[in-house]
Amino acid sequence: MDPALLTPMMQHYVELKRQYPHAILLYRLGDFYEMFFQDAQRVSRELELVLTGREAGAIGRVPMCGIPYHAFDRYAAQLVAKGYALAVCDQMEPADQAKGLVRREVTRVITPGTVLEEELLQARQNNYLAAVVRLKGSKQAPCRWGLAYADISTGEFWVCQSEGQEQLEQELARLQPAEVLLPTEEGLGLGLIRPGDPQKPLGLPNQYAYTLRPAEPFELAVARENLMQTYGLRSLEGLGCEGLPLAVRAAGGLLHYLEETHSPQRCVAPKTLLQPSPQGGHPLLPPPRTYQLTDYLILDAQTRRNLELTQTIREGAFVGSLLWVLDHSRTAMGGRTLRRWLLQPLRDSEQIRLRQDTIQELLENPSLRARLGSLLDSLYDLERLANRVGSGTANPRELVALGSSLGKLPQLAELVGEAKTPLLQSLQQVDPALVDLGRRIEHTLLPSPPPILTEGGLIRPGVDPELDRLRQQVEQDRQWVAQLEKSERDRTGIPTLKVGFNKAFGYYLSISRAKAHQVPKEYIRKQTLTNEERFITPELKEKEARILTAQTDINQREYELFVQLRQEAGSRAEAIRQVAQTLAAVDALFGLAEVAVQQGYTRPLLTTDRRLIIEEGRHPVVEKSLPQGLFVPNSVQLGSPHGPDLIVLTGPNMSGKSTYLRQIGLIQILAQMGSFVPARRAELGLCDRVFTRIGAVDDLATGQSTFMVEMNETANILNHAGERSLVLLDEIGRGTATFDGLSIAWAVAEYLATQVRARTVFATHYHELNQLETLLPNVANFQVVVKELQDRIIFLHQVQPGGADRSYGIEVGRMAGLPQPVIQRAEQVLALVEKHSRIGLGLRNQGKSQPAQKNCKKEPAPNRSPDPAVGDQLSLIPAPLFPD
């Protein structure tokens, strides 16, 4: 497009668009943000807005779409949620003061991962920006990768380096980043790839927004220099990432992106994200912290989904998830902390014990718990407020919220004065500077200031002498105007005379047209309306000028005082953030204590051995959804020296097998996140991973059938589980033919019991697997029992030793309302199948076994040496599942 064919304004628009080709450019024109060309068409389609046009010069009309400036947050939130980046161009001077074209500049770039505005964020979820650097692997070695992620709204910054594509995808699934940065060496051009776009980076899920960046900021030397310069370091040893080059590269690329999207030339805030405040202080993002995957209990995406940790499987709803049961925290920052703990349980028994101790103290002191809850209720989101003041973007109401929250710190310190646990004791140490800052904010700002900075109404009386003088002058002049109405009525004899004001004409004298003949000669007619005439006088205009000038000075002075106060708060951002993190942890543990009291949870004993003992365990979500006392508790014991490693669980459909599996997994996760658990007693060995294979779904996007998905997930478990893992399997093999399914189920159970030795519960309708108990010493049979009546069955939901020999599928079909002819025919077919089943005959006849071939090719797996004693047992497995 030839710029010479465009109007000057459109030339400027096109020039800015070339600087931000991958963002939607919102161009401020008066009271609207306008978009043109393809941006207008895209936004019109995405937001269902009217697409209009505008004359652009010699090329004629071009597509145009606009949003009102006062509705910017609402529309911007929708676009960011859809994965778009926004470049916001604002007017930098009033239109009536411009000499020629109004000066406009891009003041901020908003991308899905760089959002700071409260309206664009979810209160109880982090908004992570991630950066990934990958080195391709080979058949002999897995790929290596570095990951950095940050939430610039809360000040979190973490780095990690590991290997394996699956492990990288698991971390991304845990974080659910709003945006992922990749260097262009990943094989695609620069730009933003929105969620669901088929043009995704090779080998990565397409559910995230990817931003392809220049490779240079991700180079090791450049990234090291960026990190050291940003944080004033001479080396990276203090950060713990000196020996993690891929993590350093990812962190450097992430910092460069933030510098670019929040650079001083593009930001109207007093300071930028990574620029220290004038008073010293720290950058908005603190130095990154390093972690290892092995520090935490690993939960893959399938396990998080199957156990419904944060949302239900069917509706994707929060209500009905484990987090719904647990989240009794009183603040948004406490809710975010609890969510992180749930998705990243610990493996460090000492850290777990510290959390348990805090919950225990709150449980044993109801008065402390009640008063603490009341104080937490009065706190605002200090984590995000810290970063809002740190970035210089906090509005007056946010600063008032900060002052109010800081003012509660002395009360919190007094409340926990006799606390015994370290976390509560840490609240006793209050930074006097933060208390003083809170008082200064409360003494400076009015309690309910307007959201707009430049319209006054911010500062309390008595704070600034010059401001008080100006306000007094305005008040005196306004009193004169008010008295003018009475004096002019008396002087003119017009009782309906009024003094009015509007932005177009300022002050005026309003007189009805019926009395217009009584108007004094010195009145100057300004406007004629249907029923009234409006006049001004020289004296009234003089007072108006004084009032308006003084009001402008007042607004400017209030703005200056507010910015000074915000900068003072910004210099304390790091201290506020540290206090906020402590309070968030206390709030999360307070919520867990509340749940423990309300639901009758107990403190689990965490051990370093493999024992998993749960007495009268309960499913936390199902229990809460039922009337009190109706849930039937059940026990389990795995991994003991003389107990089973694998339980074969049989029982009817609808009896509660899946609930039993899930509650075991949930109790283990709750224990390792530091929570109390829904059980009478629990003694749990620390797990390294929890695996689940529950439910059946297909994956149409990748062309995988239900059974293929099931086999992929099962293969993942068999190749990665170890003896410290917990494995929960439900109906392996049901998605294919009976013989194939039974064979696979048998082989999987056998492999888990003899090779992996993970603590496993294997729910199945293949009752033939009950034979494993007699063949393998570390396998036991359990069943979910029912009570049979003459015409129906009653589900008791009780798990007891022994194997079931019926699934009662026809009875469940009858309960579901299948037509009676179908039920009768099913019973006839069942009788024939049971009588002539070659599977049943083979098992009853106990034929000879055929040992598995040792030279079969299989997926790579951890090096496992079979126990010779177990090998001897394999020869006892009945072979004629497929008799000759």
UniProtKB/Swiss-Prot annotation:
Question: What does the entry list as the binding residues for ATP?
Answer: 651-658
Q: Name one Pfam family in it.
A: MutS_V
Query: GO terms for molecular function, please?
Result: ATP binding; ATP-dependent DNA damage sensor activity; damaged DNA binding; mismatched DNA binding
For this UniProt record, give its keywords in alphabetical order, as a comma-separated list: ATP-binding, DNA damage, DNA repair, DNA-binding, Nucleotide-binding
Region listing for Disordered, in residue ranges: 843-884
Q: Which InterPro entries match?
A: DNA_mismatch_repair_MutS, DNA_mismatch_repair_MutS-lik_N, DNA_mismatch_repair_MutS/MSH, DNA_mismatch_repair_MutS_C, DNA_mismatch_repair_MutS_clamp, DNA_mismatch_repair_MutS_core, DNA_mismatch_repair_MutS_N, DNA_mismatch_repair_MutS_sf
**Which biological process annotations from GO are given for this protein?**
mismatch repair
Highest taxon of source:
Bacteria
CDD domains documented for this protein? ABC_MutS1
State the family named in the UniProt similarity comment for this chain: Belongs to the DNA mismatch repair MutS family.
Q: Which NCBIfam families match?
A: mutS1, PRK05399.1
Under HAMAP family, the record lists:
MutS
Q: What is this protein called?
A: DNA mismatch repair protein MutS
Species the sequence originates in: Synechococcus sp. (strain JA-2-3B'a(2-13)) (Cyanobacteria bacterium Yellowstone B-Prime)
